[in-house]
Amino acid sequence: QSTPAFYFVDAVRLPSGYTTPAKADPLGTRVQRVEPLGATPQADHSAHPPFDVNAIRRDFPILRERVNGKPLVWFDNAATTHKPQSVIDRISYFYEHENSNIHRAAHELAARATDAYEGARERVKKFINAPDVNEVIFVRGTTEAINLVAKSWGGQHIGAGDEIIVSNLEHHANIVPWQQLAAAKGAKIRVIPVDDSGQVLLDEYKKLLNDRTKIVSVTQVSNALGTVVPVKQIVELAHRAGAKALVDGAQSISHMRVDVQDIGADFFVFSGHKVFGPTGIGVVWGKREVLEDMPPWQGGGNMIADVTFEKTVYQPIPNKFEAGTGNIADAVGLGAAIDYVNRVGIENIARYEHELLVYGMAQLRTIPGVRLIGTADDKASVMSFVLAGYTTEEVGQALNDEGIAVRTGHHCAQPILRRFGVETTVRPSLAFYNTFEEIDRLIAVVRRLASVRRVG
């Protein structure tokens, strides 16, 4: 089993008193922490220069907001991330100096806009280590990305009696499009179960694979629990069974290094707004030979090479899948967000966020009445919980009163919450601009509620 991408040889910097024992990876190239999240870690504080979270925070203007008279604490990063000033400025610059439609004019602004748009595509290609820039398709977000694959690839390759595998962890966006396809084609959805920690059961997954399996579509990180899924193994097993594989990277793209060639999936999808970029822009990456075999799922301008009343000849990829005027400015903004993440360093981000997660989970475990939902050893970002005596909405409101933003509800992932016997959770979710002090503010509120917990 490969080591999760957010584990590193280097030790981490933690609050005073925390240290992290580690065990060598079998390959000898990485170190994987052996304690479950929340156990006392060991750290060599000299291993890294300090991660200057205060410098990072100055780059995000919205973090200077006050809510109910208190400094904003943004713990709703699994829903959306905030934007650094450089992204805001880049979008403004586009509208001030480059605004034009792309690809279809000889004038200067069209050339500028096209260069900016295609430059963003190149940035995405490098960020996810795609082999070919033309394999990067811009869409509105992860939801549209999965729908594109389900409608185009699925519509062509799924038939009656075929099977589609998803995991119990999936966001509704990675369930409903496949259900719609299965209903239309007479296919069947199979579900990979999870254990009591929220990690997928690979042995049970292997039992689901057969010659009727056509595609396996799984998240890399659960939006509801934070579980990091062993997607590389899942993809390898799917391919051995002759199936295609899609990985939903909406919740992984901002937390760990993504290498689509290493993962090996046929499709990888994500949203810009989950990686400090704008809303309304996302990515489908697909293997060239798979994309070239797929029909376009929308028709219109930009995706055509020639149109007569008798037939249409389509552009090659990626334009074949980008009908009409795309979200040019926000694609450029996504490119700027990737530049920002690259400057900070995704390894630095992953390391620091893991410190926060270990600390936050440990603190929540000390509060009477708190039940953590999702305790897999391999986690990223998310700390879902319920508090005895309170609805999740009541906890969320109490936190909001103190300026702390968390998501409460089912998080568009009802099946996995019901697996744990709950309908909703409180979901603080972390990003690299959060601090230990902010976690302490959250813990203080939850501890206060627990101290006056209602019974019955």
Ranges and model annotations:
Residues Q1-G456:
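Pyridoxal 5′-phosphate
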